[in-house]
Regions:
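RNase H-like nuclease fold core
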Residues: 1-48
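RNase H catalytic domain
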Residues: 55-133
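Positively charged N-terminal leader segments that act as targeting/secretion signals
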Residues: 137-146
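Short, surface-exposed, polar/charged, turn-prone segments marking secondary-structure boundaries
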Residues: 33-34, 101-105, 145-147
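Acidic helix/loop or adjacent segment enriched in Glu/Asp that either coordinates divalent metal
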Residues: 28-75
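Intrinsic disorder/low-structure terminal segments
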Residues: 5-6, 64, 116, 145
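Low-complexity, intrinsically disordered short peptide segments enriched in small/polar/basic residues
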Residues: 22-25, 112, 144
Length: 147
């Protein structure tokens, strides 16, 4: 099966939308305080947050059985910069980003996923609206109802 993963973020929260055929599932989460990760996830830059959103979106999609082994996941990037970061397979001077890329690649390998990174226009990003609405329109902050 083929899925589209949209994601967006701020320094305090991140959202993702998984589109499969005609169904869209929206989720939003706050970044936990850095002390909960022993300081490892002290988010200071948007790129860090975007890498976390991609990782969590794929991981969550697998966990609630939307994404399954051998599926195709089209990760819809709203910048060439993040697409290049995810596809160039090189280390950067940021441990959070390196760790997230490693975990995404590990998930991809273990679950035999085909990941394609595609650049889209920002206004086409389904996950952006989730961050910009005060009532968190149609986005769940937990996984109840999915598992």
């Amino acid at each position: 099966m083929e899925h589209e993963l949209y994601f967006d973020c701020t320094l305090t929260e991140y959202s993702w939308s998984i589109k499969t055929e005609n169904k869209i599932v929206n989720q939003i989460r706050e970044h936990p305080p850095a002390y909960l990760s022993g300081g490892k996830l002290d988010i200071k830059e948007e790129q860090q947050s975007k890498c976390i959103a991609i990782h969590v979106g794929i991981y969550w999609g697998l966990g609630v059985f939307i994404i399954k082994d051998h599926d195709v996941v089209n990760v819809m990037c709203d910048s060439e910069e993040i697409r290049d970061l995810m596809t160039q397979n090189r280390k950067v001077d940021d441990q959070i980003i390196n760790d997230k890329i490693y975990f995404i690649n590990q998930l991809t390998s273990h679950r035999n996923l085909k990941i394609n990174y595609k650049v889209i226009k920002s206004e086409s990003n389904l996950a952006t609206e989730l961050l910009s609405t005060n009532d968190k329109k149609s986005a769940s902050r937990n996984s109840r109802g999915f598992v």
